[in-house]
């Protein structure tokens, strides 16, 4: 095997077509050349194996990855190729008897048909792809050369075969040797390369890293759906490339050639997947679906966003849920310090919200007995001009509870009847 490097100057087309790839368990190779194209002028031949593309090893690339790698080389394409040595045929000795009548080498018509059929079995260089594979390459738009029309292919393939009549000799004729062994360039790679099975084992995988732009963070309580952008494949009406059918745009009902978007189970041309209200193309970012219509985030917020209970305007950003309604964050604030309450605790006093520190400062009450705050829901009583927890209003000497009982007071401290005249 001879390895060599070829550099093609851009722009595309480069004048060749690839076949194989890791996903086909077949090494990448040149399957067809454009006559007079850039690849043909650089000495590339049909059957050459592709070792690297622009310096990257091609052994771990799938068919689509290799094509994308070639597309990325805009003005300069560097390929490392490998070519098998052609087999040298041995010269055959031909006897030329004189003055003998000529007769065909094949004695009867049945052997003649057998030879013709056998000729058809020979592998033809450059046609290793199946018809379905070529159709897939045509649908996906991943070809690197312009195909000649079918009539030209048929004319170029119909090369007349002529057999030189072999004169009969007195010596016995040698038996027909059978079809010629194909050259190494047309033999399958698993028969030529002993390391093929190990290199393309099924358990070996390749990883593709792609950059993806995340849509904006969705508004709380809303459901955003992101766009799934697919490479060109197959799919009828949005099925994609899994069922092998050509995708049809849901908007214009035309067959899609090239890139397309899949959203809500339907396929679209990228330029026809637009907002129903403003007409903005939604190829990048998120979108909303409401009653069968598609909206961009700004239009959806304006049309379907909730209203603020204070200013009555649409809430297009962060939503504050409080008191069984919705608010702008800057509209639901403390009545004292005017700071947004957000997710903090708050208290209502005379219909206005207060944050916890301001409420305690303005309306908070402390127990005279324990000096702790009397929270909402706590049982308390008013006595001696102060507020008391019901469990804290006790005799200052014997600690008996005085709630609902007669008591005496000395130095603002409650005393029971037994200790009314005791020293405090």
Swiss-Prot record:
Q: Where is the LIM zinc-binding domain?
A: 247-305, 306-365, 366-424
InterPro entries in the record, alphabetically?
PDZ, PDZ-LIM_domain, PDZ_sf, Znf_LIM
Pfam families listed in its UniProt record? LIM (PF00412), PDZ (PF00595)
Q: Write out the annotated subcellular location.
A: Cytoplasm; Cytoplasm, Cytoskeleton
* Residues with PTM Phosphothreonine: 96
* Amino acid composition bias (Basic and acidic residues), ranges on this chain: 110-123
Q: What is this protein called?
A: PDZ and LIM domain protein 7
Which species? Answer: Bos taurus
